[in-house]
A protein has these predicted regions:
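NAD(P)H-binding glycine-rich loop region in Rossmannoid oxidoreductase-like domains
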Residues: 37, 41-91
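Conserved Rossmann-fold NAD(P)-dependent oxidoreductase catalytic core, especially the SDR/UDP-sugar
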Residues: 92-134
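Conserved beta-loop-beta element that borders a ligand/cofactor-binding pocket
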Residues: 112, 146-169
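Glycine/proline-rich active-site loop of Rossmann-fold NAD(P)-dependent oxidoreductases
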Residues: 142, 154-156, 167-176, 211-221
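Alpha-helical substrate-binding/gating segment
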Residues: 178-186, 194-228
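Mid/C-terminal beta-alpha module of Rossmann-like enzyme folds, strongest
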Residues: 211-261, 294-297
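C-terminal amphipathic/interface module of NAD(P)-dependent oxidoreductases
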Residues: 264-298
Length: 298
């Protein structure tokens, strides 16, 4: 049955591809925009002022929040860290409350990050695993998730989209990493033993569309390829894909100094599994690091 889907962050890389996929499946997509709406497929909102069209939320079957400032920025900047947090938490809180106050209570697919888990070393991480650590992105992800809870408390179906880096040549991080690798500068981070979760764009889009259409899916979902490589394995696979060698390494101390608040994400390990999605019947097209890279580079 065709759905009415409202998306915040529809103009972003993930949001635009998700919108295209949903429309291809005959669903109607309305984008929340922070400017005057140009068509019936847009609706103006201002999350920082708590302004939105209640009728749009009431008329939705599914609301998706992918809004948020880029994670790429100056990791030593307090302004960057503040925008990173507020752009995610505020938009999620406003939409969760809007859903809670609506009569129909549409499903809420709330963006989140795998940083919620924190560093777990080699331990296999599923949706049942706990959050640990106190890194910037882990703290933000916890607040981000908490902001979505009012929707579930009011009885709405809530799916938390725990997303790792999405590998596609048109977007970070693969866009930058393939250029560096082509120059022969591919380098593992530290000793390269840390697990590095990822997903192809087509699987991320496919999984989120699957959750939008699934009438009973709820809870956290790890949207990642089923076989999580180490950083060294990823670096070698990318080098092979562009016919180069990966012989370099960035020392741990250099990453800690240069990456600032993002160093824990570069050096931490999350051996992630998409257990909840696979239990529901979603089948990944790209299951290994090699498949993710080949699809992302195509």
């Amino acid at each position: 049955m065709p759905l009415n889907v409202v998306i915040a962050g529809a103009s972003g890389f993930l949001g635009s591809h998700l919108s295209d996929e949903l429309r291809a499946r005959d669903h109607t997509v309305v984008a929340l925009v922070r400017r005057p709406a140009h068509s019936s497929h847009e609706s103006t909102w201002d999350p920082y002022a708590g302004v939105y069209d209640r009728a749009v939320i009431e008329g939705a079957d599914v609301v998706v929040n992918l809004a948020g400032a880029p994670t790429v920025g100056n990791p030593h900047s307090k302004k960057w860290a503040r925008e990173l947090r507020e752009s995610r938490v505020t938009t999620t809180r406003v939409l969760a409350r809007a859903i809670a106050e609506s009569e129909r209570r549409p499903a809420f697919l709330a963006g989140n990050a795998i940083a919620w888990y924190g560093d777990h070393g080699e331990q296999v991480v599923t949706e049942e695993s706990e959050s640990t650590g106190d890194s910037l992105l882990t703290r933000v992800s916890r607040e981000w998730q908490d902001a979505a809870e009012p929707a579930a408390d009011a009885g709405a179906r809530l799916c938390l989209l725990r997303t790792p880096p999405v590998m596609d040549r048109r977007s970070a991080p693969l866009k930058q990493l393939q250029l560096v690798t082509r120059l022969g500068l591919a380098a593992r981070l530290g000793d390269g033993s840390q697990r590095m979760a990822m997903v192809s764009l087509r699987d991320w889009v496919g999984a989120v569309a699957f959750l939008a259409e699934h009438e009973t899916a709820s809870g956290p979902f790890n949207i990642c390829c089923p076989q999580t490589p180490t950083n060294a394995e990823f670096t070698s696979a990318l080098a092979r894909a562009v016919h180069r060698k990966a012989l370099l390494a960035v020392p741990r101390f250099a990453i800690q100094a240069g990456a600032g608040d993002l160093a824990p994400e570069a050096l931490g390990s999350i051996n992630l599994r998409p257990a909840a999605l696979e239990d529901l019947g979603y089948r990944f097209q790209d299951r290994t690091v090699g498949e993710v890279i080949r699809t992302g580079m195509a």
